[in-house]
């Protein structure tokens, strides 16, 4: 975070037997097993999310983790490091879309534990194929084009697995930007239900 946004992060003060203890709000929520994935998915942010997932697993491998997502998407490799960690660790990772989950954000949303993937009522979800750009020698461009097609197939296969949609349907639906409401995301299988209020 930048110094400006650091100054805007609220602090929570708690009374303990040893006196007062202050936390920034995100650290306090981490104690409740809540992780925020907000903004562009990039390497630094992905490393922080992965570290939090691993930490919470070490604290209690049998208790669910809640991953709140508000992201326009970003780097495929950074996102895949989060996804692979979500699948690897023992606790179930419940995903919640607030605001938007687009591109890699939508992929991570769908990658949550089955039956524990949610959207808030006014959130938006968008799936599409991976973006890529490369310049250089023709042979290098050809190598990168082949790699992006491999990544596209891998992402579509995993999306088909998590949504229950046939691969051919996912391939067609991700060909262009495909926006969905919370209810449409449930219908498609990206999430399991829309949360309107706590039980």
Swiss-Prot record:
Catalytic site positions: 103, 128
NCBIfam families attached to this UniProt entry: clpP, PRK00277.1, PRK12553.1
InterPro entries: ClpP, ClpP/crotonase-like_dom_sf, ClpP/TepA, ClpP_His_AS, ClpP_Ser_AS
EC number of this enzyme: 3.4.21.92
Single biological process term from Gene Ontology: protein quality control for misfolded or incompletely synthesized proteins
Gene3D superfamilies on file: 2-enoyl-CoA Hydratase, Chain A, domain 1
Gene Ontology MF annotations: ATP-dependent peptidase activity; ATPase binding; serine-type endopeptidase activity
Record field: catalytic activity: Hydrolysis of proteins to small peptides in the presence of ATP and magnesium. alpha-casein is the usual test substrate. In the absence of ATP, only oligopeptides shorter than five residues are hydrolyzed (such as succinyl-Leu-Tyr-|-NHMec, and Leu-Tyr-Leu-|-Tyr-Trp, in which cleavage of the -Tyr-|-Leu- and -Tyr-|-Trp bonds also occurs)
Record-stated family: Belongs to the peptidase S14 family.
Phylogenetic classification of the source organism: Bacteria, Pseudomonadati, Pseudomonadota, Gammaproteobacteria, Vibrionales
One GO CC annotation: endopeptidase Clp complex
Protein name: ATP-dependent Clp protease proteolytic subunit
Species: Photobacterium profundum (strain SS9)
Predominant cellular place of this UniProt entry's protein: cytoplasm
SUPFAM superfamilies xrefs: ClpP/crotonase
Compartments, as annotated in UniProt: Cytoplasm
Assembly with partners or alone: Fourteen ClpP subunits assemble into 2 heptameric rings which stack back to back to give a disk-like structure with a central cavity, resembling the structure of eukaryotic proteasomes.
Signal peptide positions (record): none
EC category name: hydrolase
PANTHER family per UniProt: ATP-DEPENDENT CLP PROTEASE PROTEOLYTIC SUBUNIT
Its job: Cleaves peptides in various proteins in a process that requires ATP hydrolysis. Has a chymotrypsin-like activity. Plays a major role in the degradation of misfolded proteins.
One Pfam family named in its UniProt record: CLP_protease
Keywords: Cytoplasm, Hydrolase, Protease, Serine protease
């Amino acid at each position: 975070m930048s110094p400006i946004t650091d100054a805007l992060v609220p602090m929570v003060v708690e009374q303990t037997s040893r006196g007062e203890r202050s936390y920034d709000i995100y650290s306090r929520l981490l104690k409740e097993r809540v992780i925020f994935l907000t903004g562009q998915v990039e390497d630094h942010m992905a490393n922080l999310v992965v570290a939090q997932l691993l930490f919470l697993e070490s604290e209690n491998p049998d208790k669910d983790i809640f991953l709140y997502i508000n992201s326009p998407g970003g780097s495929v490799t950074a996102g895949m490091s989060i996804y692979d960690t979500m699948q690897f660790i023992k606790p179930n990772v419940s995903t919640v879309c607030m605001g938007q989950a687009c591109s890699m954000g939508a992929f991570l949303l769908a990658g949550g534990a089955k039956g524990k993937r949610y959207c808030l009522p006014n959130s938006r979800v968008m799936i599409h194929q991976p973006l890529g750009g490369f310049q250089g020698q023709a042979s290098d461009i050809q190598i990168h084009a082949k790699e992006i097609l491999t990544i596209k197939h891998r992402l579509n296969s995993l999306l088909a697995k998590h949504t229950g949609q046939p691969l051919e349907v996912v391939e067609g639906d991700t060909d262009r930007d495909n926006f969905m409401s919370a209810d449409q995301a449930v219908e498609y299988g990206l999430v399991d239900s829309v949360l309107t209020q706590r039980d």
